[in-house]
Amino acid sequence: MEHLDVGPLKTARGTIKLPGSKSISNRVLLLAALAQGETVVRDLLDSDDTRVMLDALGKLGVSVEGQGENAYRVTGTGGRFPNTSADLFMGNAGTAIRPLTAALALQGGEYTLHGVPRMHERPIGDLVDGLRQVGARIDYTGNEGYPPLAIHAAPVKIDAPIRVRGDVSSQFLTALLMALPLVESAGNVTIEVVGELISKPYIEITLNLMARFGVQVARDGWSSFTVPTGVAYTAPGEIFVEGDASSASYFLAAGALGGGPVRVEGVGMSSIQGDVRFADALNRMGANVMAGGNWIEVRGAERDDGKLHAVELDCNHIPDAAMTLAVAALFADGTTTLTNIASWRVKETDRLSAMATELRKLGAEVEEGADYIRVTPPSQWTPPAGGIDTYDDHRMAMAFSLAAFGPVPVRINDPRCVAKTFPEYFTAFGGITA
C-alpha cells in the first residue's frame, strides 16, 4: 500500500490560498445548469467530486466549457435537461448524487445513478421517500434504501407538505430545496423536517446560493421550509466559489500546534460556510485567532507548555471540521468531548469508528458513542503500528497529518485519497511545516 511518512513536526508558518469549497462548487454547478442564461463559475474546486458532477452534467446534455484557471462557462437549460435518459456514475460524491437524484426525479426521464461500493452503503432512502410523496418513481436496483437507483418518468403532483427526516444527512433537505422550484405547478410547497436537523450551516449554504440564482425560500426555524414552485432559476452571470472552510481547518490547526502564524486566504468572517466557525473552536482551546473578511490567521496558545485547552463542544455547526478538532484534542491539557456528530457515521466512511480506532493507535484513550467522541491525550505516545489507515476518506488523511506534531513520526496510508477534495494537500501542508 502506498504511504507517506510525516513528522515529527515542530513548527508551522506561512500562507495558504485555499481550493474552492466542495459543497459550494457542486451546488453552484447544478444551479447554473438548471438556470436560464449563462453563468461563469470561477475558482471551482478541481477534485474527484466536482469532476463527477461535471461529467454527469455533460451526459445530461448541459454545455459546460472550461475557461482555464478553474473557471467554467455553464449554459443553463431553463430547468429541463436536454437528454431524457442517461447512465450516471457518481463515484463517492454525496454532494452530487443527492441533489441530482431529486432534480432528475422531476425531469420526466429515465436515469440510472450508481457509484463506488461505499456509495452503495450511504443511505438515500429518506430522500427517495420524500420524492415519492410528490409522485416520483424511483427504484432501488440493489439494497433497499441505498444506491444504485433507477429513476422513471412520472407525473409530479404536490397536494400536501413533504416530510423528510433531518437527523441522518442535511443533503436530503438540500436536494429537495434545490429541485422543487422545477415543479411546473404555480404556488408554493412546504417541506416539514422530521426530527432534529443536523448540519444546519449546510442548509444555510443551500438557501444562500438559491437566492443568488433568484429563488427565495422562506423558513420557520429549522422545521419548515416554503419553496416557490413553477419559478425559474436565473443565472447570476458570474459567481465566485469561496475557499473550502473544511480544508482551512487543517492549516489553522497547524498554526495552533506549530506556533504559527498560519494564514488561510479564501475564507473569512464573510463566509457562508459553517465550518469557518472552526476558528472559534480553536480560540476556545486557547489558540490566538485573527480574521478579516476573506482570511483567518492562527498562532499557538500563549502558555508555557503550548498545550491547548480541553473543551466540550456541540459540533452540529462544524461537522466536517470537527474531525480536525478530534485530532487536535491529542494536544490538549485534558479530555475533549465532541457531541452532535452522528452524521459522521454516514460519510465517506463511518468516521466515528475510524477516528476512534486511529486515535487509539497513537496512545489516546477514546470513548465513542452514537453521536459523540471523547478523547484523552496519550500519556505515552506510540508510533501507529501499520500506519494510520485512511479508509478511502480524504478528511481522515488530512486530519491525521496534524498528529505529526506529536513526538513520533506518523505514517499516512493511501495519502492519495485526498484527491476527493484537495489533490495537492500534502504538498501545501509540507510547504508550511517543518
Curated annotation (Swiss-Prot):
GO terms for molecular function: 3-phosphoshikimate 1-carboxyvinyltransferase activity. 3-phosphoshikimate binds at K22, S23, R27, S169, S170, Q171, S199, D320, K347. Catalyzes the transfer of the enolpyruvyl moiety of phosphoenolpyruvate (PEP) to the 5-hydroxyl of shikimate-3-phosphate (S3P) to produce enolpyruvyl shikimate-3-phosphate and inorganic phosphate. Its main location: cytoplasm. NCBIfam families: aroA (TIGR01356). CDD domains: EPSP_synthase. The active site is at D320 (proton acceptor). Monomer. Belongs to the EPSP synthase family. Phosphoenolpyruvate binds at K22, G94, R122, Q171, R351, R395, K420. Its EC number is 2.5.1.19. GO terms for cellular component: cytoplasm. Pathway: Metabolic intermediate biosynthesis; chorismate biosynthesis; chorismate from D-erythrose 4-phosphate and phosphoenolpyruvate: step 6/7. Pfam families: EPSP_synthase. GO terms for biological process: amino acid biosynthetic process; aromatic amino acid family biosynthetic process; chorismate biosynthetic process. It catalyses: 3-phosphoshikimate + phosphoenolpyruvate = 5-O-(1-carboxyvinyl)-3-phosphoshikimate + phosphate. It is found in: Cytoplasm. This is 3-phosphoshikimate 1-carboxyvinyltransferase. Keywords: Amino-acid biosynthesis, Aromatic amino acid biosynthesis, Cytoplasm, Transferase.
